[in-house]
């Protein structure tokens, strides 16, 4: 009979502990000081009770005893204070350092992700994990170092000291523990599902904010402010509603704790009062006798001590419930962070990967590709293509024809599902990723500029580039003229996302940045769509003259952008349906011919009208 092994749950905490690193020392020292503080706190009621008993007895050495016990209490209070302060300092150092390392590790992990990994986590979700989730885990880590160490120790000390004071009455405190534990577990079992939903709705809330802020110009141009407000309010209400439901359940926690301890305190007070008044009160309970309980051995001092320990236990239980709630919330945050940390990049550099790309030749051999193994349909099918080094290749196709998908396989942003992609005669999987991507510069559809000067943005291509090199590539990209029109020229500050430059200017800056890398392969993914046809032609002419040995792949919607290419590909439904130069395709491809004629008809008509005038 075969036995099926249950899949093991992933360890949530272990991936996070690796971020403690250099903060192990303060993480170990903090609990030591907390243990000292807890021990001192538990000795104070004991000696306070002895002091009360001494005063009550009114013996010959009363003042001497008062000074002795008073001195001990003062020393314990100072020791407790210093231990608490030092524990707080070390805990703050450890938790803040841990959070810093955790954010560092998360951010670096995301930087290593492939496009497929990034597709798995939405950008809003990653932002939440790097901010809110890390903050939750940081607070819980600090709480664990301090309160989570102190509470069980102080509770244990208080129980022990209660039994040393009077075993019979101490059992009353012990008896309420199972009731309180059961109530706490029940409360958290009901509340936890709400916390899971809350974090998912936090992602939706952040996504709403990101979309709105990123597309604020579109929102305003379409007068959609009210719709966006309603969408945001809905997301905010959902977070509020789930938080409210969870808090309503957790609200039972403290009252239940307080009630139980107060009942115990009342019982102890009543029984102690009877015992103090009547020495024979416990005679009826001789069968259950655990320790001596007489007026000679028990008095107001011992009663005060027991009540103090009861208050300490109440405080410990309430703090424990608070820790339990906080840890339950942060456990979901820890799970989300751990999910990112344990996710391995789908694409990794091989050991001893090839460190040099010989040339800009590209070859696709029987390539098929789909974005996930579960997908029913291939995004690319039966791709066989050969591009010689230095060739210019144009790619045309309708929306959704997988033009961008095709070029993303070249710098290995994705791996082909079937077949091989070769660059410089070598399978892209054999290259060191950094080496390959330095030689394949891609200007994507979505042009991204970062906050900083134009020079700083351009030097993403080559951080050691001289000013002369910057000017050269900007002239090739037809960007030099408009840059010099700015008052600060190349030192002009670019706002986040490039919001203070036009779409065409942004595209040309991104092209210049790519050229600065001096790549063997340059890919422009519809990267001149926002420039006029004259500027587009100037860019293409500059490429032909200045970088003839660079393989150039141009994805475009305008036939004029690719008609002078050595080779033009027509994609439809993820397949290459036509391949040839302009003259060949005009004869053999009806789609190309119709597209060309449709795009040039208006221009021809205008020229004819101009000739007749």
Where are these regions (language model features)?
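An intracellular "coupling" helix at the cytosolic face of ABC transporter transmembrane type-1 domains
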Residues: 21-25, 112-116, 132-145, 149, ...
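Helix-loop-helix
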Residues: 62, 71, 161-175, 245-336, ...
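Alpha-helical transmembrane segments of multi-pass membrane proteins
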Residues: 26-27, 76-95, 146-153, 174-201, ...
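Membrane-integrated ABC transporters
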Residues: 1-41, 48, 55-73, 87-91, ...
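Juxtamembrane helix-loop junctions of ABC transporter transmembrane domains
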Residues: 9, 32-33, 40-53, 76-123, ...
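Transmembrane helices of ABC transporter permease
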Residues: 22, 26-37, 50, 82, ...
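Short intracellular "coupling" helices and adjacent cytoplasmic loop segments at the cytosolic face
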Residues: 2-7, 96, 104-128, 132-134, ...
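ABC-type nucleotide-binding domain
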Residues: 355-613
């Amino acid at each position: 009979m075969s036995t099926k092994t249950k899949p093991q749950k992933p360890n949530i905490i272990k991936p996070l502990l690796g971020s403690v690193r250099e903060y192990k020392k303060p993480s170990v020292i903090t609990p030591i000081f907390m243990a000292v503080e807890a021990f001192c706190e538990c000795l104070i009621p004991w000696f306070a009770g002895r002091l009360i008993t001494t005063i009550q007895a009114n013996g010959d050495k009363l003042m001497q005893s008062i000074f002795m016990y008073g001195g001990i209490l003062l020393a314990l209070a100072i020791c407790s204070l210093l231990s608490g302060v030092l524990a707080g300092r070390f805990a703050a150092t450890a938790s803040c350092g841990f959070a810093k390392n955790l954010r560092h590790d998360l951010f670096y992990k995301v930087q290593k992700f492939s496009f497929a990994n990034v597709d798995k986590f939405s950008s809003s979700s990653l932002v939440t994990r790097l901010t809110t989730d890390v903050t939750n885990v940081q607070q819980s880590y600090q709480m664990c170092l301090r309160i989570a160490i102190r509470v069980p120790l102080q509770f244990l000390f208080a129980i022990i000291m209660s039994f040393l004071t009077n075993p019979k009455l101490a059992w009353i405190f012990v008896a309420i523990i199972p009731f309180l534990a059961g109530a706490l577990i029940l409360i958290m079992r009901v509340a936890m599902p709400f916390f899971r939903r809350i974090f998912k709705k936090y992602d939706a809330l952040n996504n709403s904010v990101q979309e709105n802020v990123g597309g604020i110009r579109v929102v305003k141009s379409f007068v959609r402010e009210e719709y966006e407000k309603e969408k945001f309010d809905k997301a905010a209400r959902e977070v509020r509603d789930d938080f409210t439901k969870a808090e309503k359940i957790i609200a039972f926690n403290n009252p239940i704790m307080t009630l139980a301890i107060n009942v115990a305190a009342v019982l102890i007070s009543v029984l102690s009062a009877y015992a103090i008044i009547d020495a024979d009160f416990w005679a009826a309970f001789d069968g259950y006798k655990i320790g001596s309980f007489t007026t000679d051995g028990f008095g107001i001092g011992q009663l005060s001590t027991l009540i103090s320990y009861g208050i300490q236990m109440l405080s410990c239980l309430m703090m424990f419930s608070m820790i339990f709630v906080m840890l339950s919330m942060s456990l979901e945050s820890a799970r989300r962070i751990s999910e990112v940390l344990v996710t391995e990049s789908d694409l990794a550099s091989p050991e001893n990967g090839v460190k040099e790309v010989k040339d800009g030749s590209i070859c696709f051999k029987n390539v098929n590709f789909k974005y996930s193994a579960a997908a029913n349909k291939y995004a690319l099918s039966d791709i066989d293509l050969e591009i010689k080094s230095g060739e210019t290749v144009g790619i045309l196709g309708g929306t959704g024809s997988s033009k961008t998908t095709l070029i993303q396989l070249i710098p290995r942003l994705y791996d082909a599902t079937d077949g091989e992609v070769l660059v410089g005669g070598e399978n892209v999987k054999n290259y060191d990723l950094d080496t390959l991507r330095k030689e394949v510069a891609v200007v994507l559809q979505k042009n991204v500029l970062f906050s900083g000067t134009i020079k700083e943005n351009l030097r993403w291509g080559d951080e050691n580039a001289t000013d002369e090199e910057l000017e050269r590539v900007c002239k090739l990209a037809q960007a030099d003229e408009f840059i010099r029109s700015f008052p600060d020229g190349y030192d002009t500050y670019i706002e986040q996302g490039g919001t203070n430059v036009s779409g065409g200017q942004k595209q040309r800056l991104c092209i210049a940045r790519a050229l600065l890398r001096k790549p063997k392969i340059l890919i422009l993914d519809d990267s001149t769509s926002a420039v006029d046809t004259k500027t587009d032609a100037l860019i293409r002419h500059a490429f032909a003259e200045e970088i003839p040995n660079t393989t150039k792949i141009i994805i475009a919607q305008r036939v004029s952008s690719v008609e002078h290419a050595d080779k033009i590909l027509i994609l439809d439904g993820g397949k290459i349906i036509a391949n040839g130069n302009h003259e060949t395709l005009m004869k053999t491809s009806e789609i190309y011919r119709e597209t060309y004629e449709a795009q040039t008809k208006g221009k021809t008509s205008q020229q004819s009208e101009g000739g007749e005038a």
